[in-house]
Curated annotation (Swiss-Prot):
Glycans are attached at residues 127, 131, 157, 197. It comes from Mus musculus (Mouse). Pfam families: Tetraspanin. It comes from the Eukaryota. Keywords: Cell membrane, Cytoplasmic vesicle, Glycoprotein, Lipoprotein, Membrane, Palmitate, Transmembrane, Transmembrane helix. Structural component of specialized membrane microdomains known as tetraspanin-enriched microdomains (TERMs), which act as platforms for receptor clustering and signaling. Participates thereby in diverse biological functions such as cell signal transduction, adhesion, migration and protein trafficking. Acts as a attenuator of EGF signaling, facilitating ligand-induced endocytosis of the receptor and its subsequent desensitization. Mechanistically, modulates ligand-induced ubiquitination and trafficking of EGFR via E3 ligase CBL phosphorylation by PKC. This is CD82 antigen.
Length: 266
């Protein structure tokens, strides 16, 4: 390998690892966000889903390893330290294997995860109270108001709430209330609201002034719309990682051959 080519490879690998260092910080931050977030669907799930909490710690661990790996790769590439390049190669290979494993597990457990999410949401709906003081209830109110959905499958899921259905007048979950399209301001209401000019003597969900579409459909629609982007990002990261493996091997072999060329021959 020519000296010029080696120099280009070395500094390209340095730039690559600098980006990887930043990526590691982003992944670590994402894991911390999952644990700390209190106002989204993530918060609803993590309060009762051990799988999501484990996933958050995995993100934190992978992020930390990626940061260390990026640092080792930068030092190893600039100073041509073969040992550090070797460690970098091993770390990168392990991360690539882990990503493929997680992807396969997620694909084959998608139905199980969907069922777990549904059970979690329905548990919140059944036990929801007019005061809505728990973190799970507040988080679910935020989700319904932000996404403009109601219930998991539909607004009829709320008929399983005994307190709500015990009202004699038209009463509905406040966070499900249908807002005018021109009103872009997000207002998260809590508890149960009584419909204006309610004259009926029973609480019929047909009369609720709410969004009728369930949050499950909204989530599926979002995934379908952004599936191409998600797939492209994952494929791009995998290609970059494979390129990093290739460059580290090339530089490692060059350093190895250079070391042997300096040995005196008799």
């Amino acid at each position: 390998m020519g000296a010029g080519c080696v120099k280009v490879t070395k500094y390209f690998l340095f730039l690559f690892n600098l980006l990887f260092f930043i990526l590691g910080a982003v992944i670590l931050g994402f894991g911390v966000w999952i644990l700390a977030d209190k106002n989204s669907f993530i918060s609803v799930l993590q309060t009762s889903s051990s799988s999501l909490q484990v996933g958050a710690y995995v993100f934190i661990g992978v992020g930390a390893i990626t940061i260390v790996m990026g640092f080792l790769g930068c030092i190893g590439a600039v100073n041509e330290v073969r040992c550090l390049l070797g460690l970098y190669f091993v770390f990168l290979l392990l991360i690539l294997i882990a990503q493929v494993t997680v992807g396969v597990l997620f694909y084959f457990n998608a139905d199980k995860l969907k069922k777990e999410m549904g059970n979690t949401v329905m548990d919140i709906i059944r036990n929801y109270t007019a005061n809505a003081t728990s973190s799970r209830e507040e988080a679910w109110d935020y989700v319904q108001a932000q996404v403009k959905c109601c219930g998991w499958v539909s607004h009829y899921n709320w008929t399983e709430n005994e307190e709500l259905m015990g009202f004699t007048k038209t009463t509905y979950p406040c966070s499900c209330e249908k807002i005018k399209e021109e009103d872009n301001q997000l207002i998260v209401k809590k508890g149960f609201c009584e419909a204006d000019n309610s004259t009926v003597s029973e609480n019929n969900p047909e009369d609720w002034p709410v969004n009728t579409e369930g949050c499950m459909e909204k989530a599926q629609a979002w995934l379908q719309e952004n599936f191409g982007i998600l797939l492209g990002v994952c494929a791009g990261v995998a290609v970059i990682e494979l390129l990093g493996l290739f460059l580290s091997i090339c530089l490692c072999r060059y350093i190895h051959s250079e070391d042997y060329s300096k040995v005196p021959k008799y």
